[in-house]
Structure formats: C-alpha cells, structure tokens
Amino acid sequence: MLHVSASKGMTEYFKNILDNVTELYTLADDCRKSGYDVTDHVEIPLAKDMADRVEGIVGPKNVAERIRELVSDLGKEPAALEIAKEIVEGKFGEFGREVGAEQAVRTALAVITEGIVAAPLEGIAHVKIKKNNDSGEYLAIYFAGPIRSAGGTAQALAVLVGDYVRKNMGLDKFKPTEDEVERYGEEVDLYQSEVTTFQYQPKAEEIRAAVRNISVEITGEATDDVEVSGHRDLPRVETNQIRGGALLALVEGVLLKAPKILRHVDKLGIEGWDWLKELKSKKEEVIEEIEEEKDDFNYEEEEDLSQYEDYEVEAVTKFIGEVIAGRPVFSHPSKKGGFRLRYGRSRNTGFATDGFHPAIMYLVDDFMAVGTQLKTERPGKATCVVPVDSIEGPIVRLKDKSVLKIDTVEKAKQYRDDVEEILFLGDILVNYGDFLENNHTILPSSWCTEWYEKILKSENLEYKKEFIENPDQKEAVNYAKLTKTPLHPKYTYFWHDISKDNINVLRNWIIGGKYNESNDSWEVTYDSENPEISNAKRYLELIGCPHTVTGEKLEIFEYYPLLYSLGYDFDEKRDIVEEIEEKLQNTKNNMHFINTIAPFEIRRNAYIYVGARMGRPEKAASRKMKPPVNGLFPIGNAGALVRLINKAVEEGKTDEIEISNVKCSCGNVSLYRTCPFCGNSVEPSGPSRIKLPIKEYWYKALENLKINKAGDVKCIKGMTSKDKIIEPLEKAILRAKNDIYVFKDGTTRFDCTDVPVTHFRPVEIHVGIEKLKSLGYLKDIHGNSLENEDQVLELKVQDVIVPESCMDYFFNVSKFIDDLLEKYYKKDRFYNVNKRDDLVGHLIIGMAPHTSAGMVGRIIGYSNANVGYAHPYFHASKRRNCDGDEDAFFLLLDAFMNFSKRFLPDKRGGQMDAPLVLTTILDPKEVDGEVHNMDSMWEYPIEFYEKSLEGIAPKEIKKIMQTVEDRLDKDSQYEGIGYTHETLKIDEGPLVCAYKTLGSMMEKTSAQLAVAKKIRATDERDVAEKVIQSHFVPDLIGNLRAFSRQGVRCKCGAKYRRMPLKGVCRKCGSRLILTVSKGAVEKYMDVSQTMAEKYEASDYIKQRLEIIRSGIDSLFVNDKRKQVKIEDFFK
C-alpha cells in the first residue's frame, strides 16, 4: 500500500520499483545466509518514509509509527519536540538519564533533518548531565564536526531541542563561569584565523550574550589541532583544542539563525529565549544581508517620465573575492556585457541550475562545459552550467572588426578562432524559484519574446507564432508602428549601454550612409584612423547591432529597425527628427532620448547583468580510495607501496597486522565466519595482531573461484573499523578481474555532478522506443503516443540518466556481481549483460557524501555529458540542490550483497556517506524543502514581468506563480510539471571543461587570462591580481609554513612528527624522506611573478612576491656557496 498521492500510472511505477527492490533484497539475503559474509543478512534496512529512516538510523525501536502520527497532527518541528519528550519519559523503553537525553536529542534532530543527513549520528558526539558550581545539574550537548551537514537551522534547533529536553527532565540551566564565557570568544577568533571563516562573523558581545543565556552547554570534542592560549585547562572543558562542532552550532546555528529560532520559539511556546529578540534587532541587517543578499535600488522618479527612470542595482562582489588560478572570470559584478538576466525554466534547469546558450560555452574556449560550476553574483552563490538554445546567444566582434550574433552552435564553432572580443555573453536563464529560495528581490526582467507575446495577448492583437520567434526586420518595425506596441525584442538593441550623446554621434554617422540594393544592406564609410568614425563604430558594437566590415565599407543588414530607431524613415528616405539638439537637451537619459526620436516604443533590453566566474569543473569518475584498491582485505606492508597481494605471494612476503581472527578446530587461523579450509562456522573473537597467512588465503581464494592465475590485485594495508573484520579475498580478486574498485563500505561507486532534468527526448539518452515503453513511458507531454525519438517525455521521479562512462563502469560492476553470484555463492548469474545498454531498467542507489540514507533510482539511459541527470525531487531526496555538487551512484544489488556497517572506519564521520538506511519510494513532502520553491509553470503571467520592474520581494507575487509546493499531496505532485523554455539537446556544448585538459599551471593561467582579455565584461588585470592575491600568495605562504613544520615519512608507511635521533626509520631502518618537497613550496613562484609583470600588477603585489621569494631563497639557496661556470675564473 503506497503512502503517497499518485496517479494510477505512477502507482504502477512505484509498485514496479518496490517489486524489483524486493527481488534484489531476497537474492542478496539468500547469498548472505551462506555464511561467507560479515553477517547473515542484508545490512541496509528499507524505509518507506521519513519515520522509517529515523528509526533505522538513530532509533529507538518502534518509534516510526509514533513519528508518523505526530508529524501528521502537529507538523515536523513540533513533532520532533514531542517525540523527544516521550523518549525521556520512557515511552520507548527505559534508558538511563544521560542515555535517554542523548537518544531524545538524536531522534528529534533526525526528524528535523528528514532522517537523511548524518548529523544526528555523527554530529552529536554525546549528551551528558553535568553539575554547575552550585551543585545543580544541567544538560551538556557535545557537538562534533559533522553537525555541519545538518545546516544552520537544524544546528540551532538541536540546541532548542536540548533546552526542551532539559526542562522535561527537570534539570537546571547551564551557568557558565566568566572563563568559560571568554573561552568561546577565543575559540571563535582562533577558528577563523587558523581553520576557516564562518558564514557569519559575530561580535564578542553577541557570543557572550548567547553563552550566558542559552540554557544548555554547547560544547564538543576537539576537531582541530589548534589549542587556545588564554583560557586553558578549564575544569568543565575537557580539551584545550578548538571545538569546531560546538562553534558551528553556536555561530552558524544559534547566532546566524536567530530570526528563525524566534519564529519556532513563538510558534511552539517555548520560554527562555526572549534574549534573542534584542540580538535579532541589533543584527537583523547583517543577517538579512547574508541570508538574502538584498540589493539597493535607486530610482529617479519624475512625473510621466517614470518609464525612463534610471535604474541602478548595487553590484554583489562577494563571488569574485577569491579567484582560483586556471578558472576564468566570465563577467565582473554587474558589468555591462555580462550575462543578461532572463526569467524562466527549461527542462534541464531549475533547483539552482541556470541555463546558458551553448554557443557561449564554446566561445569561452570550452571553460564552460555541461555541468561546470559557476560562482555567481545572484540570486544564489553558485550554479551549474547547462545549455538552453532558445535564449539569447552571445554577440562578438571578429578580428576583421565585423560584429555577429552567434545564435547557433555551428556558428560558434565556425567563428571561435576569429573572435576578437565578446561584446555580450548572452542570457542566463534563472527560474523564479531560485529567487524565492534565496529570498532575493525580484529584479527587472530583460526585454524578451515571452514578455512581448504576453503584451500582444493582453491587447488582443493578432500574430503568428513564427513572428514571435523570428520576425522579418520590416515586419517587426511595421507591426510596432501599426499596433503602437514596443519594438520586437530581436531588434531592440542595448541603447542603455551608451549615453544619449553617444547615440546622437552614432545617429549622425548612420543616417549619412546609403542603401545598397544589390545586397539589401545599408552602407556607411568606415575609417579606423578617423577618431569620430571609430567612436561611432564602437557605439554600434556596444548596442549589439550586427554589421560587416569590408575595407573602407561597413554594411548593416539589420538596417530597417536600426534606422527607424534612430529617427530615419527608410521608406521615404528622410530624417523624421526635428530639433535634435533640443531633444538631446530636454530628454532625461539614453532611453528617454531614443524613445523621443523613434516612431515606436523601444524597451530597455537589459536591466541586470549577472557576474560569474568558474567554480569547479564537471565530474564523472569512478569512486576510488587513495590509493585505489580492489578489496578490503588487509596485507600490511607485504605488498610494498603498490599494495599488490599477488606480488607479496610471489615474493613470499607477509606482515603482522591487527585483524579479527579465530583459531578453527581444524587447526588453521580463520579470518572469516566460515573457515575457508574446512568449512566450519566460527565466530572471530575480535582483533588481535597476527602474522597474516597471505599465501594460504590467496591460493585458497583462487581455488574457490576456479581461477588458475589472477592478475594484479590491490589490497588495503589495514582495517580502520572497530572490530577489524575483513572482506573475503575472493571479492577483491573478482573486482580486479573486472577492473573495478571498492569504497570503504564494500560498495563500488561512480561519482558525477548533479544536474536536474524534468523532461527528455529518447534520442538524448540512447534508448529505443520499445524499451522506453516497457519502462512505462507511453505518451509524450502532449498526450500523444510515443512513436519517435524526438518526442519530449516527462521523467519519472526515481529515474536517472547517467553519464556514458558510468554505464561502462557499471557494465563491469554487473560482470563482477554475476561472477560473485556464480563463482563464490554458487548462484545463477543475475544481470547477464552483453552490452552496456542492457543495464537500462536496472536499479541503483543515489547518495550524497554528507548523508547516511540512500535513495533507490532506476537507470533509463545515458547521456554524452559528464553529469548525472535526475529529477529535481531525486536530488532533493539526497538533501542536495544542483549548484555544482557531486554525488554517487552504485548498483543496488552491489550494495545489498557487499555493504557492511562493520567495515566503516571507527572515527568521527565514519558513518557518513554510508547507506545505513534506504528509501524505496520518493515522497516530495519529505525531501529538501528547496525544491518546493521550484516553479512548475508552462509560462509566466504578464503580471510577473510588470511586477519585476518594481523590485518586490518574491513572496509578494507567489500567488500568481505556481511552484512545486502547490502540488504537494496531490496526484499532480509527480506529473505535469511545466517549463517555459525549450532546448534542443540537454547535452549540447563542450563535454569536458578546458581546465581538465590543460596541463601545467602556467598553461591554465594563460588560458584563463586569454578568456578574460577577450570578454568585454571582464578586466584581465584585475583577474591577474586576484589570482595572485587570493590563490598564489596564500598557497606560497602556506607551503612555506608547512615546510618548516613538516614531519618525515618512510617507504614502509611510518610517519614521524620529528626526525628520530637515529636519523632512520625506527620500524624498518630505512632512510626517511620529507613530506613537503622544495618543488611543492615554490611551484607557484615563477608563474606569479610572470603574471605580475605581464599584467602590470600593483607595486604592493610585486613587492609581496619579492618578500616571499626571499623567504624561499633563504630556505633553499646557500648564500655562502655559489655555483659558477669555468669561464667566470678567467674574467
């Protein structure tokens, strides 16, 4: 019985997934019962909803049903508090006081975070009941580093939950001493100077106020090897080191999220938090700036000229504060010629992913590939690059001084080597939902065809769709004149980017030309040596009007709208503007002037240009540990640095390591639960140091698999898990045979960048029509039967489109699973694939590294792009958006058969990125709430565009927009989601970012600055300075410091903080080597100084580099010994 609202078709889809999950679970469980694995059962519990996930990850037992009841009646946050109260009251079993309090806090936090992230497990080390100096008892919550994965709001609510638990247990408030209060301030300062900066920088008084007023102690375990110097050895603080988890909960939780805490406090009626109101009022402006990045708008309003008002928006410079070497800046903040803001959503955008014309992706020398992350100016901090070919492409000036609109990929490839300057980068397509999510003011929309069509509809005017999409220039002008409507966006130039005086200079030059009937163009004289003509030519470039230069002749083929816009009647061959100087004098600005001289209304083409720089490149690669290994079978140092067990066997080597083992009755040492020598069931007693019988286990494994000779098999040196229980060697051999690698938990994974897609064409995913029909894709978005590969289909929410390289890797994984079934478990092969396409329809798990819950998915095809396409709901189910992060896929049967909790490292964070529970059916209500703000409309109403000019808050127009939130708990929550802009191919554009193909850092920075040089919206000198200041200088200084503090290591793996007195390894006697080399210290020195000279960096930067150079030379250059050439002696 499904617990979600869904149509008949979607119900059948979910039933099919559940049946397949059950089939795989049964098969894996049957294999496990053979006794060859760590346990006799599959170790991944299945969860149908959030309540099951919470019980599966943190418990207590039988809590799931009560969570469902409370969430249904009260809502998520009140339910979390109530379940915490019931736990400490003993309704789910008798716990000790501290154990009960800890269980209550963990369970409540798990409810708040939907039972997905690892924070309830790993982010809370423990909860203790401690004593104040007056002997009263209070509650202390020990936070750890992984609490970060919960997010600021959940961190703050964890403290609120702790206070609620404290009250219900009848405990006193935490009463800190002055030393303890000041300790927090010292730790915050030290954390920011030595570790990393917080999202919010609190003042000392705010920290003191919070610590004195919060009723529970926010403390934690040491997370960083940095000690306080002032407030040390405090009786109630167990460490002198920084407590990173506690600081995160205090600063990015309570202090940063104060307004949200107050809303919950008021809503839930919790007392004792009134002190936050004063803190909120003092810091509200700063907090809003961080959370909302609200802009300042300045208007100059005058009577009936308001439509021509000057519009300014304050540039947001935060994204460009740090520029990484080799990663270009595409546009400086709000710089003219940058990405023009356009509203809407394509089938492959939304949920923090923005659309760009694929042509610009090629013109920036392939630095924008499909899936490349960009750090952006607004509305959010980052986005992912995807192609949308229905928006405006770039405008470029060629080396012959001609100007072209590059509106196709073919043109981009044809002219890419001839581009001298990119005058306009094209549109950035951002959906309303991203503004709503970031609570960012709705900025004025660009003048676009969808707005234009809305105006024509509102005035009940007749038009053809072809006219909206691609009108003839004369048709566009005459339609505007006849209907008194604004000029079509296609022929609306960037008049606002030049002054009205510039417009007049351009006008005088243009109307002085003549019509060339032979090629239907307008010709003007061009002389690059003439300053006046050169200036006029530049103005023509800046407004984005295409033209061709041939010798001393400049031809304009879009002459009709240009001439009329400049007040020249082409048909009558006359200037229709009278008293031009008076109009120049009396008009308010450029847009007022151009509208005064033109016979029709001309709208402002762009209000907002968005700045952006490259973040990280796209990724699609198999997950490998460092170094990569085939199995979790430890061999110590017997395999040398390459860790090859077959080499150790050949050379007769072994090693003594700590491992779980037991002496079997047959006389042999068994490392498994079933003795490989006699078949008896044994139970390893626990870890102890033994001399590993590598040779015996190797040949026994080959015998079991009926393999005469295996190739290279890489193994680990030792287990980091608590019990040191190992994986059977047979699995390592079979993985190596199939060229795949293992992760820490026994699974084999593939990582790729998250990209959303709600609709696809069969041709894009390399799957036949009949196969898609068998997977439930019967009709396209228009209700027509699926018949050809170009029809658009709506993606089902748990279906994924993986990269082509992922299919190849999973093809090998499936061969490994089948070999494992046949050769090791003596079962029938399951996948039986002959080619990668045979994997279509099989189930996988999708998982983010900061979580402990996986989501079942189904492969329905693969794309050429190096990204993982999935429904926005699917990404949200992993607590991810799509701003450039990467997650993992792995085959479901692989996880069921090979995953074990007992392989996981016994350290803080060890249980993160492990499928401790698996969600089988995706419920949109229980995914990350950000996706609820994504709009799901087929078109935006005209009111949206009109209201955008007013600079209003996104919530003010939510009633006229439709978002995912409006569809929840209805059958339509899974189907019928719309999009406003079409794109021909979701994987059009460069597939590999240039950053990944270039070699040395010198090559990368040269390419980075070459891109900056040819983009009008970018200043290459500023880019060079920022690269040096924000990347090279900190790296050089950091490496210098690391060199002076470094330890030494040995080839056997031993590491020493200081050189031993003997001067050799105490373990094996070998020579010790440095961990930081000279090359690592000075690797950026030469490139930094070369850049500083070439791009004329400031004297300050040059001098700073000289100081660093002298510091490096003082370490590595001997002033007393100088190498000379033989001829120097004859001088």
UniProtKB/Swiss-Prot annotation:
Recorded superkingdom: Archaea
HAMAP family to which the protein is assigned, alphabetical: DNApol_II_L_arch
GO molecular function, one term: single-stranded DNA 3'-5' DNA exonuclease activity
Organism of origin: Methanococcus maripaludis (strain C7 / ATCC BAA-1331)
InterPro entries with a match to the protein in the record: PolC_DP2, PolC_DP2_cat_dom, PolC_DP2_central_dom, PolC_DP2_N
Protein name from the UniProt record: DNA polymerase II large subunit
Family listed: Belongs to the archaeal DNA polymerase II family.
Job description of the protein: Possesses two activities: a DNA synthesis (polymerase) and an exonucleolytic activity that degrades single-stranded DNA in the 3'- to 5'-direction. Has a template-primer preference which is characteristic of a replicative DNA polymerase.
Reactions catalysed: DNA(n) + a 2'-deoxyribonucleoside 5'-triphosphate = DNA(n+1) + diphosphate; Exonucleolytic cleavage in the 3'- to 5'-direction to yield nucleoside 5'-phosphates
Enzyme Commission number(s): 2.7.7.7, 3.1.11.1
Subunit details: Heterodimer of a large subunit and a small subunit.
Pfam families the record matches: PolC_DP2_cat (PF24846), PolC_DP2_central (PF24844), PolC_DP2_N (PF03833)
Keywords: DNA replication, DNA-binding, DNA-directed DNA polymerase, Exonuclease, Hydrolase, Multifunctional enzyme, Nuclease, Nucleotidyltransferase, Transferase
GO biological process: DNA catabolic process; DNA-templated DNA replication
